[in-house]
Amino acid sequence: YTSSSDLHNTLATTQSAIATGNIAIDCILTAKLDYAEKHGIKTEYSIMAPENFPLDSVELSSILGNIWNNSIEAGERLIISDPTEHPYIYFYIKPYQNMILIHIENNYDGVIKGSIDGDILSVKQGKEHGLGIRRVKELVEKADGVLQITSDNKIFSVHIMIPDKENNKLL
């Protein structure tokens, strides 16, 4: 989004807004779910967010925006490469012990680029490939969390565990 009016315009055309009580989650998910639906990507989600999320709204928005963008782009590529495939995104946020789990999973066309050290980078060309996932990794590490990325049988998963230091109640 280039301005707040772009985000507002997107939210204004959305069928149903997500209302968890966390503005970062609500804004990102409302926009991304609407976009995915309009582009033929099936979505399922479950949100059980804590009252005080252990990341600030900018960090949380960056993480959610990046992982959702990657999943949506994978769905769009899948439609182009094999129109018989049905792209999907499965997403959840939930507490587990003293952690907050953020998980996104999608099917994809099987094309991934990696770095020498085994990090998954991107399928994009040019200087900006892989920047989003690197940013996610930085933010998760800053929060003393764990980022796990897996790819198996054309299923791509990002699993993030963030310590819930306040062990606070759910919204």
Predicted regions and their residues:
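Short beta-to-alpha transition helix within the HATPase_c
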Residues: 5, 9, 21-39
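Conserved short strand/loop->alpha-helix "switch" segment adjacent to the catalytic nucleotide/phosphoryl-transfer site
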Residues: 17, 43-64
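Conserved polar catalytic motif of the HATPase_c/GHKL fold
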Residues: 65-74
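ATP-lid-like helix-loop hinge signature
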Residues: 73-95
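Glycine-rich/acidic phosphate-handling loop/turn and adjacent ATP-lid/helix
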Residues: 98-130, 169-171
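Glycine-rich nucleotide-binding loop
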Residues: 110, 152-159
